[in-house]
């Protein structure tokens, strides 16, 4: 059948429902599945199967997440929904569910609640670029003014965290009524899908971003020079291009004189490929695992940053005891561990296993980083936490 083939050509986006407990995230997820599947085909996932989210492990952290897929006229979406607040925290910090956009669900009967605020803040911290709002349970509010008030409150809250609160789409609907097949409310789900299509820009593909390759191994090849191997994280590297070797020691510039994959010589290496890169005039001892090769000027090495962090619970194999100021674990970035000192925020004396917080890290050596880079926190090779760089300090 040629139809399925055509579908795959649609641009793909990752989205997810976020918001306060019992505001209707899972019901909305089921409603989107039902309404869009009716319109575009595909497999319907009902509320029970979404609510019964399977357990996954990401970097040793247990997360319950449901995944559904759906199509609109122009796009294909992968959508994640989590049953519990802790699952959202872990999901967003580990990047297990990278979101191009979040659908913030707010019950019109309640208005913004503590987790509404927390999820908006998390989205800002971990770099979810866009949010749109679905005001749910609007069938239960008769007062038009009350709906306007709730919408205004949500918009103000979003603006407080630097999202464009005045401009982003807010759809007033009822997930439950749409799920029950009421055409008036089904239309609101279609309106939400339309808002996703028109308001959320297509993310830049990895291949179009500036080249970067985290170095995993370094070899010396007699008569040819030094080869570094690793998986191209993003961008394209072509033979003859200049690259910088960044992190751990002073930045050096060199030229790529060869790209090989499975012992075959190539003209270029692309995002997602495992390649070996031959470097001109670079000695075996000038490069090490943990550095990155990157397009000159595209990324800088830093030692001090603010991270949004989740500390594993004892049950997840994390620490059994809290840690205090002066804590110095290793921070695993891309391919290597580097020691760093933790500065706890004002008023925080200790951090318990299972906690989520933001703190400042001072590394003993520079690492190539951008905001949004994920890392693990380790003690002697054992993962005890996960984090994301939310702000670079120096």
Curated annotation (Swiss-Prot):
Region (G4): 136-139
Xref: Pfam families: GTP_EFTU, GTP_EFTU_D2, GTP_EFTU_D3
Chain spans, region G5: 174-176
Annotated residues for binding of GTP: 19-26, 81-85, 136-139
Residue numbers spanned by region G1: 19-26
SUPFAM superfamilies referenced in this protein's UniProt entry, alphabetically: EF-Tu/eEF-1alpha/eIF2-gamma C-terminal domain (SSF50465), P-loop containing nucleoside triphosphate hydrolases (SSF52540), Translation proteins (SSF50447)
InterPro entries the record matches: EF-Tu_GTP-bd (IPR041709), EF-Tu_GTPase (IPR050055), EFTu-like_2 (IPR004161), EFTU_2 (IPR033720), G_TR_CS (IPR031157), P-loop_NTPase (IPR027417), Small_GTP-bd (IPR005225), T_Tr_GTP-bd_dom (IPR000795)
CDD domains, A to Z: EF_Tu (cd01884), EFTU_II (cd03697), EFTU_III (cd03707)
Class in the EC hierarchy, top level: hydrolase
Subunit structure: Monomer.
Protein name, as recorded: Elongation factor Tu
Organism of origin: Psychromonas ingrahamii (strain DSM 17664 / CCUG 51855 / 37)
Organism placement in taxonomy: Bacteria, Pseudomonadati, Pseudomonadota, Gammaproteobacteria, Alteromonadales
Gene coding for it: tuf
């Amino acid at each position: 059948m040629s139809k399925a083939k055509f579908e795959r050509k649609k641009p793909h986006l990752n989205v997810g429902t976020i918001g306060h407990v019992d505001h209707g995230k899972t019901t909305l997820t089921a409603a989107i599945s039902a309404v869009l599947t009716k319109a575009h085909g595909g497999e319907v996932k009902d509320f029970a199967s979404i609510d019964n989210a399977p357990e996954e492990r990401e970097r040793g952290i247990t997360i319950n997440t449901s995944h559904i897929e759906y199509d609109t006229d122009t796009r294909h979406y992968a959508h994640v929904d989590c049953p519990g607040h802790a699952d959202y925290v872990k999901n967003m910090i580990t990047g297990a569910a990278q979101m191009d956009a979040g659908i913030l669900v707010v019950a019109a009967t309640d208005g913004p609640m503590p987790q509404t605020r927390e999820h908006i803040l998390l989205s800002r911290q971990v770099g979810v670029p866009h949010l749109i709002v679905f005001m749910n349970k609007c069938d239960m509010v008769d007062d038009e003014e009350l709906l306007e008030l709730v919408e205004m409150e949500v918009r103000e809250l979003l603006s407080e965290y630097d999202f464009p609160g005045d401009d982003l789409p807010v759809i007033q609907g009822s997930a439950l009524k749409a799920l029950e097949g009421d055409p008036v409310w089904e239309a609101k789900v279609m309106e939400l899908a339309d808002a996703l299509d028109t308001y959320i820009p297509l993310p830049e593909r990895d291949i179009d971003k500036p080249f970067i390759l985290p170095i995993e191994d370094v070899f010396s090849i007699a008569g040819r020079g030094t080869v570094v191997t690793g998986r191209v994280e993003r961008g394209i590297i072509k033979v003859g291009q200049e690259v910088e070797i960044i992190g751990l020691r002073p930045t050096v510039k060199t030229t790529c004189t060869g790209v090989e994959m499975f012992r075959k010589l190539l003209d270029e290496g692309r995002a997602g490929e495992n390649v070996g890169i031959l470097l001109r005039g670079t000695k075996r001892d000038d490069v090490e695992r943990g550095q990155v090769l990157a397009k000159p000027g595209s990324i800088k090495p830093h030692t001090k940053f603010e991270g949004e962090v989740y500390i594993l619970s004892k049950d997840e194999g994390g620490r059994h005891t809290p840690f205090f100021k002066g804590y110095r674990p290793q921070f695993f970035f891309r391919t290597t561990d580097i020691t760093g000192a933790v500065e706890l925020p004002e008023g925080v004396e200790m951090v318990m296993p299972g906690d989520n917080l933001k703190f400042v890290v001072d590394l003993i050596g520079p690492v190539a980083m951008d905001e949004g880079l994920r890392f693990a926190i380790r003690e002697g090779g054992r993962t005890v936490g996960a984090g994301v760089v939310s702000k670079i300090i120096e």
